[in-house]
A protein has these predicted regions:
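Phosphopantetheine-dependent thiolation modules in NRPS/PKS and related acyl-activating systems
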Residues: 2-35, 45-46, 51-79
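Conserved ATP-binding motifs of the histidine kinase catalytic
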Residues: 38
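Two-component histidine kinase catalytic core, primarily the HATPase_c
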Residues: 41
Length: 79
């Protein structure tokens, strides 16, 4: 899967699952603020990404995933 295709799929999935406008999910936007995530919702997001893309996001890596660009790069390099 090409990176742009992966990003489009991820944006669509996250927007639908967390009821956020796709336009709000910009590469440099803060994930927690944009999606209004608390710690439980963050766990849900990680599980969803793991399931949809077959990439395990490791707990120690979570603090480094601040923006959607960080998340895209993390997932794409591990696919």
């Amino acid at each position: 899967m090409e990176k742009e295709e992966m990003i489009k799929k991820m944006v669509s999935i996250l927007a639908d699952e967390f009821e956020v406008e796709q336009e709000a999910i910009q590469p440099e936007a803060n994930i927690k603020e944009t999606m209004h995530l608390d710690s439980l919702s963050l766990v849900d997001m990680v599980g969803l990404v793991n399931e949809e893309f077959g990439v395990e996001i490791k707990t120690p890596d979570l603090p480094s995933l601040k923006t959607f660009a960080d998340l895209y790069d993390y997932v794409y390099t591990r696919m």
